[in-house]
Amino acid sequence: MKQHINKPTFKVGIGYDVHKFDNIEYDATNTFITICGIKINHHKKIVAHSDGDVGLHALTDAILGAVGCGSIGQHFPNTDNKWKDAKSDYFLIEAKNKAQEKGYYISNADIIIICEQPKIMPHALKMQEYIANLIKIDTSCINVKATTTEKLGFLGRKEGIAAQAIVLCCLQN
């Protein structure tokens, strides 16, 4: 295989994650889910091996993909008890560190949370600030938005939550 003489200046990665909600109804004032690092009250819990943060999982996957380091499942497999109930912050920081080891920094990221409930947009700015602080970049370089599936499919039936992320990594000078 022919090697590049120079590393590419820009690399793009795409990430995706989905988790189902459990089937138990909880008191939403005492129950929360974590999305993009922010706790949001919700009447269902996420079923996951780690903390189930679909936003941070998708972003982690996008960063790892951009710099050619595989996927979140390869680095933090849900078959390994080491990652049971792990905070997704750790996954994201590790992905950022891997990008830096390869000579890249995260330029910007766009994350979309897909669900009928809970409502994400009231928390989007806090999510952006949380992620930016975690990976040490300007808040203007992180975007979090939300959409629904217009009540179609398992997400439309409120059976789960999903996220997609795209990230641009740039070669460090």
From Swiss-Prot:
Pfam families: YgbB. This is 2-C-methyl-D-erythritol 2,4-cyclodiphosphate synthase. GO terms for biological process: isopentenyl diphosphate biosynthetic process, methylerythritol 4-phosphate pathway; terpenoid biosynthetic process. A divalent metal cation binds at D17, H19, H57. It comes from Ehrlichia canis (strain Jake). Homotrimer. Keywords: Isoprene biosynthesis, Lyase, Metal-binding. Its EC number is 4.6.1.12. Binds 1 divalent metal cation per subunit. 4-CDP-2-C-methyl-D-erythritol 2-phosphate binds at residues 17-19, 49-50, 76-80, 147-150, 154, 157. Belongs to the IspF family.
